Amino acid sequence: MSLAASALSALYARPAPQAPPHASHLRRNVMATLGLALVFGAAARVIELRPLELLHDAGNIGVFLRGYLHPSFAHLSEYAWQCVITVCIALWGTLLGAGIAVPLGLLGARNLAPHPVVYFAARRLMDLLRAVNEFVFALMFVTAVGLGPFAGMLALGIHTGGVLGKLLSETIESIDPGQVEGVAAVGAGRLHVISFGVVPQVMPNFLSYILLRFESDIRSASVIGMVGGGGIGFYLWDTIRAFNDREAATVILLIVLMVMAVDVVSSRIRRLAI
């Protein structure tokens, strides 16, 4: 074969030119943006999103809010005591949830589950506990144990157990396996491996999750009384339903102050303990 023929063959054998990497990356970003825009556009149509009506009805909103500008403090002590009950509901609900989360988190972690069936069952149970809202659990427990804070605490605890269990299992799955293998290498049993190889690695994050969930449970406990779960939520629903704007304003103000105080305290505890 001649030199010219070889050069011609090599020329045609070259691969087709490809688009620069940045061009394909830009194209993917544009397509992803258009896809998200279509999804949000369809969702806006489903929920009948009409933001201009807020401006059109701004006068009615102002009339509604003016009724809340002059809170009444005639029943302040009663409402304050209900806030204390609400904090206690959240406190024990979070504690119950943490207790439920520990076995579920251990069994629902892929690297600790004793069998795939156990792993699957623990995961699905956590999904169930997270999927059912606290209000639904509260309605169930009100039927079972009657009206009051105990039903609210059980509802919060069951739901919180699913949330914390999911977070704990994912934390366990991301731990350093070297420390676990080191404990197992000296002949330690499964309980000792968990105690000395797993717990020290996950405890700081788990405590942080518990404190964050306690803040969330405070907010949930503030309204769970609407369905008979005890606490300040019942008075919030009662005053709003009766169009007693001044009393409702007092209840809302106390709830806001309670949530702010709990957030500040839990943030300080988290910085000191973790």
Identify what each model region corresponds to.
Residues 1-95, 102, 107, 111, ...:
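N-terminal, non-cleaved signal-anchor transmembrane helix
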Residues 80-88, 122-129, 133, 211, ...:
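Alpha-helical membrane-interface segments at transmembrane helix boundaries
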Residues 208-211, 249-274:
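C-terminal transmembrane helix and the adjacent membrane-cytosol boundary/short C-terminal tail
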Residues 143, 218-255, 274:
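Glycine-rich helix-loop "coupling/hinge" segments at transmembrane-helix boundaries
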Residues 104-138, 167-170:
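Cytoplasmic-entry segments and transmembrane alpha-helices of multi-pass inner-membrane transporters
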Residues 147-213, 264:
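Membrane-cytosol interface at the C-terminal ends of specific transmembrane alpha-helices
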Residues 76, 80, 84, 114-121, ...:
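Alpha-helical membrane-protein architecture signal
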Residues 126-157:
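Generic hydrophobic transmembrane alpha-helix motif, especially the helices
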